[in-house]
Amino acid sequence: PLRGVAMHQDYLGKGWAITERDTDESLALVHEVGANTLRLAHYPHAPHTLQRADEMGLVVWAEAPFVDGVRLSCSDQPATEEFVANVEQQLRELIRQQYSHASIATWSIGNENTMTQGRCGGGDNVTPVLRRLHEVAKAEDPGRATTLADLSLGGQGEGKIRVSGITDVWALNRYYMWYYGDVLGLVRDLDGIHAKYPRQPVGVSEYGAGAALGDHTDNVLGGPPTPFGSPGARAYQPEEYAAHVHERIYEVLASRPFVWGTYVWAMFD
């Protein structure tokens, strides 16, 4: 099975102004944790990253920079022609620039694109764009699978806007035990979706919990941790609780052979 992590291409104290050596150090840690797949979120990463992934035998999820909805306000207004042309161009550039890297297994056409589904009555202006991007990717590279990372607000099944069936494979961003719910919510999501779409492989593109270096506990159930800070108080995110979340979620994932790949969010913070 594909078990791995997602990562950004930044580095402590440097932001994006990183060197190839910084990337090598990051990928060495990816190897150390035993990952065999890497999600390069949420945009094209530097050529050196792909070169090293080729050499290390990692299976790469490469992603176009299409995040959230097609508008910042109401989701019942269609995407403009200019927007669609722009995101199509960026997907084509991603594929044409990185096509020759053997490590790449999937082209991701988007991340959490139903984020605006709760606005304006949950109108759908997203799936037409995603379907078009799938067509673009298959025209550019018929031999590789397309994918996307689906977000259902609150973690409730598919949500109002369904993106299943658009890409060859797909995956879920789910934060049970952190932003909402318990581990049984993930069980219901995965088993229910697999029963409904048994012919389309489903993965988990994001899961996890916050982990602050300065927060620790000897009772992971004594909490409660806080995903967000509040006025006058900072968030409380003990590392041990993050490890507990990973262990519980991973137990669910490992027991479901129909899950094609899983990615912890995130390898580096």
How does the language model describe each region?
Residues P1, H31, S103-W107, Q117-C120, ...:
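Substrate-binding clefts and catalytic carboxylate motifs of secreted carbohydrate-active enzymes
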